[in-house]
Amino acid sequence: MKPNQNYPQKIVASDGNVYYSIRNLAEAIHSDRTCIARDFRLKGRYEKNGVVYTLCDINDESNKVKVVTIEKERDDEDEYQEFLEAKKVTQQPFQIYKLKPWKRSRGYRYAVALFSDAHIEETVKPESVNFLNEYNIDIAEKRIKNYFVNLATCLERDEVEELIFASLGDTISGYIHAELEQTNGMSPLEATFKAQSLIYSGLRYLRLDANLPKLKKIRFVGIVGNHSRTTKKIQHSNGYKLSYEWLMYQNIKKECEITNLDIDFFIPESELAIIKTVDEKTFIFAHGFQIKSGGTGTVCGIYPALNRLVLKYSKVFKQDMLFIGHFHSSVNTPNAVVNGSIISYNAFALTNGFEYERPQQQYICYDSELGGQLLTRQIYCD
């Protein structure tokens, strides 16, 4: 067809063909007219089977580009408007928006650092876990040192003013199973003395040696785990009295008092520690053995049992967040945080098909101005 003088656009194909309307192009290449118009509006071109179709202007009669003969001419003004819109898009320049950094007003910053499931005297031979992990007393010491150094880095970076250091138990493995009596690298008492020295050294580092000018307050929460018990079964009313960890926490507290290390201690005579934060939040800390083993064997993993525990506690305590350990897996939900472990993968995890996880501990930073969590970090210990 001949070009219409009132229709000064053409579609030029990369194969040399020329089309004078979207309808003509659609009929010639058997494509949907709406799709072609949309691509012209959004991209300024249309592509099919390796051929690119581009909008151009008709200059004059001397244009020698091959014209495809189309029997049907443009019969409505709408198609002409489609050309104009598509052409307009291709000719518009980019608009540059100015971006200006701004500083958010900040409130009182406090962080919860979880410390649990170190099992420092337990032995993990690489061969027993297909070389996914190795663990012994020396590696445990190294990982705990790394934890405190990395924790100090987080506190400095986040300008934290108050630290809630929550030791959630199972720092030692103890002798609760015959297998542990045969394979542990230390007795429970030896492991307790080793663990209390490592934890005290880490707290001392945070208070005196790390460069943390913003950190004004440290609150220590000490929860006993199930591995540190001296009884065959867990005892609920007086379990703390029969735990190596409760003795360990008392020793750490006394040493801090003797050396004037400014740390507030809360060592409950209960399975739970319930504290209030500066912005009136209620936090519950527990080891996690309150969730029975059935909570990890389902398709949904720990989540159903964890949510049930959260709901049960909420009826009584109206807590904002529950923090637990025990499961050696980092889990975060809107109402609960499950800590990872320092020991990482062992033969028990392999036998039960648990997911592998690097040695890590949870760290959650809060800002009173925001009214909730500012950020969550994983503190890696390896």
Regions found by a protein language model. Give the residues of each.
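Conserved beta-sheet core of the metallophosphoesterase superfamily
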Residues: 238-246, 253-262, 267-271, 279-381
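Short, amphipathic alpha-helical "recognition" segments used to contact nucleic acids or chromatin
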Residues: 3-20
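Major-groove recognition helix of helix-turn-helix-like DNA-binding domains
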Residues: 32-44
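Short Lys/Arg-enriched helix C-cap and helix-to-coil transition segments
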Residues: 44-63
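Short alpha-helical "recognition helix" segments of helix-turn-helix
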Residues: 24-26
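Divalent metal-coordination and catalytic microenvironments
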Residues: 117, 170, 199, 225, ...
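Active-site neighborhood of divalent metal-dependent phosphoester bond hydrolases
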Residues: 118, 127-129, 135-137, 174-266
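N-terminal active-site segment of His-dependent metallophosphoesterases
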Residues: 61-200
